[in-house]
Regions:
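A glycine-/small-polar-enriched, mobile loop at the entrance of the PLP active site in fold-type I
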Residues: 17-68
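Conserved active-site segment immediately N-terminal to the catalytic lysine
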Residues: 183, 197-208, 217
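Active-site phosphate-binding strand-loop segment of PLP-dependent enzymes
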Residues: 24, 123, 134-190
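PLP-dependent enzyme catalytic core of the Aspartate aminotransferase-like
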Residues: 17-18, 340, 344-360
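Conserved PLP-binding catalytic core of the aspartate aminotransferase-like
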Residues: 298-329
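PLP-dependent aminotransferase-like
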Residues: 91-158
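Conserved N-terminal alpha-helix of the aminotransferase class I/II PLP-enzyme fold
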Residues: 47-93, 100, 122
Length: 360
């Protein structure tokens, strides 16, 4: 029968898992994958997979509610913030943010990489987008000083990409927005450390880096920003209010993705929450950065004070040598170390689920 065939296949394919340094979709905790595999055919006595379950069913309602409640616990999200599980990735938020938050049709953007730049270009479609600081002059290898920014008087928000996946930089101090709303794309650092949600008007994160499979984007938005007052022509599906009112069930959500995110939230809670996660991430990053700082062959590309704990780009200075390193690493079971084409060299993405052994 099917089951014995499946078990036989499993025996045959006793594959060892590689160390996957992909920037996203990225490594997920092995325990979570095993648990999902065990529940694949029959989720807790329902006789069906979560993939097959109606999003309006009692069983699924419990899954999505628990996912939200665990996320609230992890980040200590106050009651006056909504949690939304949406689709369209972080890239769709580049449009949703201005559509919903641009009241004066103006916003300030800090350009620290490809994704901040894309958000800025998208913002410019809907109103006046001002680039008030940028690190483009040095290939985005640092975070500009944001202590005294020329914040525009009429700006509805100041926008940052908090961790720059491609360039390996991170804001360790949030910008002084001079009283303006702060909007942050946290896709590649989400849940890697504790965060004071109250410092932001809106946070969003694509799930496929630190929390789950691709297809889900998590939005945390202060409820006074969730209104009917959106740019004219904003589609129903692109209004935060549509999804907040329907508790992320306005239409069929990415049900399986949310279920997987929920499992990762439980995994994080079991490991001591975000304080413990930050400590572990610091330990992993330190091993790698210390090695790069002492190495005669490799060097990191980021200004020390702005180094990300999640994405670590490094180079040898010789393209052929870089290519050889990537090739030999792959043969040794270290996958996806090739750097982004705009930086070259290598990049190790060492998200929450990357075990320390993969780095050390």
């Amino acid at each position: 029968d099917m089951c014995s065939k499946y078990n036989h296949l499993k025996e045959e394919n006793k594959m060892s898992r590689v160390y996957n340094f992909s920037a996203g979709p990225a490594v997920l905790p092995e325990d979570v994958l095993k648990e999902a595999a065990a529940e694949m055919l029959d989720y807790r006595g329902t006789g069906m997979s979560v993939m097959e379950m109606s999003h309006r069913s009692k069983a699924y309602d419990t899954i999505i509610k628990e996912a939200e409640s665990d996320l609230r616990d992890l980040l200590h999200i106050p009651d006056n913030y909504k949690v939304l599980f949406l689709q369209g990735g972080a890239s769709q938020q580049f449009a949703m943010v201005p559509m919903n938050l641009m009241k004066n049709k103006a916003a300030d953007y800090i350009l620290t990489g490809q994704w901040a730049k894309k958000a800025y270009q998208e913002g410019a479609i809907y109103g006046k987008a001002n680039a008030i600081a940028s690190s483009a002059d040095k290939t985005f290898s640092y975070i500009p000083d944001c202590s005294d920014l020329p914040v525009s008087e009429d700006a509805d928000y100041v926008y940052i990409c908090e961790n720059n996946t491609i360039y390996g930089t991170k804001y360790w101090t949030l910008p002084n927005t001079k009283g303006k709303l702060l909007v942050a794309d946290q896709s590649s650092c989400f849940l890697s450390e504790p965060v004071d949600v109250t410092k932001y008007g809106l946070i969003f994160a694509g799930a496929q880096k630190n929390v789950g499979p691709a297809g889900t984007v998590i939005v945390i938005v202060r409820e006074d920003l969730v209104t009917e007052d959106v740019l004219s022509g904003t589609p129903t599906m692109l209004r935060y209010k549509t999804h907040a009112d329907a508790e992320s069930l306005y239409n069929t959500p990415p049900t399986y993705g949310i279920y997987m995110c929920g499992k990762v939230f439980k995994w994080l809670k079991a490991r001591g929450g975000l304080e413990a996660m930050k400590e572990y991430n610091e330990k992993k990053a330190e091993i790698l950065y210390n090695f790069l700082d002492e190495s005669q062959l490799f060097k990191g590309t980021v200004v020390k004070k702005d180094r990300s704990l999640m994405n670590v780009p490094f180079v040898t200075g010789d393209e052929e040598l870089d290519a050889l390193f990537v090739k030999e690493s792959k043969a040794a079971g270290f996958e996806n170390l090739k750097g982004h084409r705009t930086v070259g060299g290598m990049r190790a993405s060492i998200y929450n689920a990357m075990p320390a052994e993969g780095v050390g």
